[in-house]
Amino acid sequence: MSRIGKLPIEIPKGVKISYIDSNLMVEGPKGSLGRRIMSGVSIDLTDNTITVSRDNDGIKSRSAHGLTRTLINNMVTGVTTGFETALEINGVGYRAELKGDVLNLSLGYSHPINFQLPKGINVEVDKMTKLLVKGIDKELVGQTAAKIRAFRGPEPYKGKGVKYANETILRKAGKTGKK
């Protein structure tokens, strides 16, 4: 039995869940999310809990059991509280600016980077060097933050680039030089 998969998911007030033909829809105060549930896993909806169980003990069913439970829990959390990831931009002249749903990044290249934000993702820019990526889909929030970071990842000598707010950069010493 999966240690994560066997835990029931509490459904908060204001969240509606519908499960039809292996499609799960979760609606809440922040929006709605849908996902197709993998084969080999079944879902039991009771009054205010969701229980995930597997049909057999095959390798596919065992691996999908805990994953399905975690994905459903992330959907419920997303439509109630949402998810956010903080990014920091370090470097002279490095800045971010939001125009509509396009994030303009100036990261030391000869050209500005215009990043089109996906639907369902909001970005808040604070002092042109701090970004807060918000949304209800945890996977999409993390993926968007990773794409923004990938434009100019932090370098180990001066720490310039885009990094996660809680990320520590291992710094290297430069060349000592010949005297």
Curated annotation (Swiss-Prot):
**Ranges that cross the membrane:** none
**Which Gene Ontology BP annotations are present?**
cytoplasmic translation
**Keywords for this entry?**
Ribonucleoprotein, Ribosomal protein, RNA-binding, rRNA-binding
The UniProt entry, under SUPFAM superfamilies, shows:
Ribosomal protein L6
Under the cellular component aspect of Gene Ontology, which terms does the record hold? cytosolic large ribosomal subunit
Write down the Pfam families for this protein, in alphabetical order: Ribosomal_L6
What PROSITE patterns does the entry give? RIBOSOMAL_L6_1
InterPro entries on file: Ribosomal_uL6-like (IPR000702), Ribosomal_uL6-like_a/b-dom_sf (IPR036789), Ribosomal_uL6_a/b-dom (IPR020040), Ribosomal_uL6_bac-type (IPR019906), Ribosomal_uL6_CS (IPR002358)
What molecular function terms (GO) are annotated for this protein? Answer: rRNA binding; structural constituent of ribosome
Q: How does it assemble?
A: Part of the 50S ribosomal subunit.
Family membership: Belongs to the universal ribosomal protein uL6 family.
Q: PANTHER family per the record?
A: 60S/50S RIBOSOMAL PROTEIN L6/L9 (PTHR11655), LARGE RIBOSOMAL SUBUNIT PROTEIN UL6M (PTHR11655:SF14)
Query: Tell me, what does this protein do in biology?
Result: This protein binds to the 23S rRNA, and is important in its secondary structure. It is located near the subunit interface in the base of the L7/L12 stalk, and near the tRNA binding site of the peptidyltransferase center.
The protein depicted here goes by the name Large ribosomal subunit protein uL6
For this protein's source organism, the top of the classification is: Bacteria, Pseudomonadati, Thermodesulfobacteriota, Desulfuromonadia, Geobacterales
